[in-house]
Amino acid sequence: MQQEIRNSNTPNTGSGNPVSNLSSALRQVHLGNSNTTTDQSNISIDYTSRAPQQQPLDELSRGAAGGPAAGGGPEGSNMVGASSAAQVTAFGGPSVVDSSRITKFFQNQPMEGYTLFSHRSAPNGFKVAIVLSEMGLNYNTIFLDFNLGEHRAPEFVAINPNARVPALIDHSLDNLSLWESGAIILHLANKYYRETGTPLLWSDNLAEQAQINSWLFFQTSGHAPMIGQALHFRYFHSQKVPSAVERYTDEVRRVYGVVEMALAERREALIMDLDSENAAAYSAGTTPLTQSRFFDYPVWLVGDHITIADLSFVPWNNVVDRIGINIKVEFPEVYKWTKHMMRRPAVIKALRGE
């Protein structure tokens, strides 16, 4: 695991004004005026078949994405191969369910560790896998076959009444079942902290815990669904609706503007803290922050180390180029942040489906 660099909170100047030219410039970013409250996404696609044509996030994915693992599709969606679309109903999958593989698993469950139910094209499933991998936990992944209707197997619906992925079984807690990616990774973070006393991907500070929760809810309710809707209307909706494509793509940009601002302020605080001999020049704007040797150091949304708040964005950042957003050009802080996370061995392992 790469060494974490200390990062202080955004400095308080007493006047509420930004302390350098970086945050001043970023405050000009158009954050939009959307008042959307949509929290559902529907994508009908298996990106596995599209993987050879995709080059998501250029060098960010080299050696890390491992092919189809980084594909796109949210909770609340059943993704099926485009070639088999005619064989399924609108949202429910095939009319006949083959649940034999799922039934066999539930007849002989493990006694320990975790079982993750996911899909090869489900970013939210890989979100959970990343956290499990980062924590070094023992887990096995069952990638459901939606073409067989495995997500509708009675045994699976019993642990996830929403019949979507991801779902997780915690075998150490009498086969406790959890669903919804945000709830799952919060459980993992809290359990790890309680059992070990180490706030891995978490915090022992109550205020920071609240901030982590805020970003996590922002990602699950705003970031992921907007990308999901943009993908749906761009590629798979039965009719071309340019206004819908534009509306959801603009909303994704607005969301990234929020993240970009937060990361930029974190970077500014880090540079002012670690590069104190040049702080006056940075504050005056006579020396750009880009000249600091700390300009490419990792910064995180909350506190001085990576948390579940940061990692929850990774799989979705890896597919956003498919809606025409180049984060390297449009959101450079988001790009650097994603790059640091995509290079982590545990993230690489999880995205490869290992």
UniProtKB/Swiss-Prot annotation:
- Would I find Protein biosynthesis among this entry's keywords? no
- GO molecular function term, any single one: phosphoprotein binding
> Where is composition skewed (Polar residues) in this entry?
1-56
Q: Name one Pfam family in it.
A: GST_C
Q: Give GO cellular component annotations, separated by semicolons.
A: cytoplasm
Q: Where is the GST N-terminal domain?
A: 112-196
* Keywords, sorted A to Z: Nitrate assimilation
- Where does this protein have compositionally biased stretches of type Gly residues? 64-75
Work out whether the entry's keyword set contains DNA-binding.
no
Single GO biological process annotation from the record: protein urmylation
Q: Where is this region: Disordered?
A: 1-80
The cross-references to InterPro entries, in alphabetical order and at most eight, read: Glutathione-S-Trfase_C-like, Glutathione-S-Trfase_C_sf, Glutathione_S-Trfase, Glutathione_S-Trfase_N, GST_C, Thioredoxin-like_sf, Ure2
Task: Show where the GST C-terminal domain sits.
Answer: 205-354
Which residues, if any, are the signal sequence? none
What does the record give as the function of this protein? Answer: Plays an important role in the cellular response to the nitrogen source. URE2 gene plays a major part in the repression of GLN1 and GDH2 genes by glutamine, and is required for the inactivation of glutamine synthetase. URE2 gene product may catalytically inactivate GLN3 in response to an increase in the intracellular concentration of glutamine.
**SUBUNIT field:** Homodimer.
Query: What's this protein's family per the entry?
Result: Belongs to the GST superfamily.
Q: What is this protein called?
A: Protein URE2
- The organism encoding this protein is Eremothecium gossypii (strain ATCC 10895 / CBS 109.51 / FGSC 9923 / NRRL Y-1056)
Which gene holds the coding sequence for this protein? URE2
